[in-house]
Amino acid sequence: GLLIVLPKKPKRSEILFHDKPKELQLWKRLSMPEELQRIRSMDEWFEKPAEFRNKFRSYVEKEFQRRRDGVWFYNNGVPTYITGRQYMFLQWSKIDIGYPSYLAFQREIFLHMAACEADPRCFGQLYTKCRRSGYTNICSAVLVDEASQVKEKLLGIQSKTGKDAQENIFMKKVVAIFRSYPFF
């Protein structure tokens, strides 16, 4: 077993879904304020009056904090940490079946990815996948997450052929996930 250090568990009141009964504690997407759902670009955001932007600034900043630091949520009474990348996957990455569900084995994939990224001795992640595990969607979401944070970063896609990478992964997965991201 690989030991991975998680962030310190916050106070109960700071863990998502702490106010729900144990049997109803499961991952559920958090709704965006209705006024923000209509905004499609940063240009539209900056055209809004300062009062409007100030009203929702804390929401946007909280989303960036969750993206950067990850988030804790209650899962059937168990405080569970997910990385920022998994948060972006679950909260904002619309895939071919809609938004993904939380799956515990995918949490392990995201935690291992984060450990690989944090360890300068690590050359990467080798994952022998089976079909229908969601790994292609996970990697597509990670690509969009990274590409949308770093200017002029070169990222790659690997598949059976270049054509398959372009048509089935980039066009059908990466572009769809990018389009589902919020304006911020």
Which sequence ranges carry the predicted segments?
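Phosphate/NTP-binding elements of NTP-utilizing enzymes
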Residues: 1-184
